[in-house]
Amino acid sequence: MSSVAKKDKPTMSVTALINWARPAPPGPPQPQSASPAPAAMLQQLPTQSMQSLNHIPTVDCSLDMQWLNLEPGFMSPMSPPEMKPDTAMLDGLRDDATSPPNFKNYPPNHPLSGSKHLCSICGDRASGKHYGVYSCEGCKGFFKRTVRKDLSYACREERNCIIDKRQRNRCQYCRYQKCLACGMKREAVQEERQRNARGAEDAHPSSSVQVSDELSIERLTEMESLVADPSEEFQFLRVGPDSNVPPRYRAPVSSLCQIGNKQIAALVVWARDIPHFGQLELDDQVVLIKASWNELLLFAIAWRSMEYLEDERENGDGTRSTTQPQLMCLMPGMTLHRNSAQQAGVGAIFDRVLSELSLKMRTLRMDQAEYVALKAIVLLNPDVKGLKNRQEVDVLREKMFSCLDDYCRRSRSNEEGRFASLLLRLPALRSISLKSFEHLYFFHLVAEGSISGYIREALRNHAPPIDVNAMM
């Protein structure tokens, strides 16, 4: 397995790159290209911190809004081919080019970790036997939604479309037909729904919280497929001449800015398609995303970094211990080493992410269902300043609390207090998030004034619609 760096949102990765990058290769300097529209990275800092940094010159870290379409291979016409991000310039960051192309790596307690079967429908790694055949979570969810909602599809080609891991979302008709041909049983879906309904009644006979069928942990787990494909090319984004970033580091920092913007764009799409979130007032949607994007991206880095933690070892006295974590996964296929983080002056943040988040998550054996539920809870925070309708947000968050509590009771019934243990990870996440954001703001890689407009524009026009029947 190739090494990967720790999880961190664009804020941390951009900051760290300032000292992690190697000097630019010899030769004439690259021509400066005009900067596209302002990029958005945001989050409110305490007023005192904001005022103390007012003297720092602003940075032009901009993004072409068309790029929010997330089309693979999109390059801005203002970015010549030679200006594509050069990962070889990033000291401490390694591209996992040797990773098997057909299998993605999963954290130790991920539902797909250790699976030896392939999905009969698309060939992805199977999470188990569902409705009669070995299948992945994506095809399982697709088949279940099709049956439960009695959906019908049409093929635009000749009803013989290729259904594999990369093309399974292109034709729903052929995907459904392949599910049937491989042996998936419609009646098994209905039987499962009846069993779940009876179980819910027995577990909470007098519960006043009615969790909708749409807002569920299962649905949120399927939505994780919205994460951008790491194999896609990134439009090159230049850091402006007035930034605090040393000139020789601006190219690699710009590359990470671009990666960060792409992840934020995917985050906007993910948030918008959470059931009922889109029914909130647009202003409230913007406020919620603006207040949580930093934590959510940092949480994703901690989740991915679990895979790169070394296993515990048994000492002579029978106790168990682990070595200091050395790798953080900034994004799929890219890792950051602890030495590089220390050289950049963010070693303390690096260690906190791995020790207070990744290690604790592994100790808890946090699975993906719990992870996505916590992400939704972070987003749906009724205490965020500026909300117009806190009650609606509070109702949604209470539903997520109920979903997570119910999941813990069903899946870990022998672990009393698990629900509370999971929630106790959130204060640490918040604290680390604020500290990492201070570094981003210092280098003016966060456009505080334009983030709200960026999110609003993405929610209105630029975020591509998600077909819930074709997710994963």
From Swiss-Prot:
It is found in: Nucleus. One of its GO terms (molecular function) is nuclear steroid receptor activity. GO terms for cellular component: nucleus. Keywords: DNA-binding, Metal-binding, Nucleus, Receptor, Transcription, Transcription regulation, Zinc, Zinc-finger. It comes from the Eukaryota. InterPro entries: NHR-like_dom_sf (IPR035500), Nucl_hrmn_rcpt_lig-bd (IPR000536), Nuclear_hormone_rcpt_NR2 (IPR050274), Nuclear_hrmn_rcpt (IPR001723), Retinoid-X_rcpt/HNF4 (IPR000003), Znf_hrmn_rcpt (IPR001628), Znf_NHR/GATA (IPR013088). CDD domains: NR_DBD_RXR, NR_LBD_RXR_like. A zinc finger (NR C4-type) spans 119-139, 155-179. Residues 1-118 are annotated as: Modulating. Residues 212-462 form the NR LBD domain. Residues 119-191 bind DNA. Its main location: nucleus. Residues 192-198 are annotated as: Hinge. Composed of three domains: a modulating N-terminal domain, a DNA-binding domain and a C-terminal ligand-binding domain. Belongs to the nuclear hormone receptor family. NR2 subfamily. Heterodimer of USP and ECR. Only the heterodimer is capable of high-affinity binding to ecdysone. PANTHER family: NUCLEAR HORMONE RECEPTOR. Receptor for ecdysone. May be an important modulator of insect metamorphosis. This is Protein ultraspiracle homolog. The gene is USP.
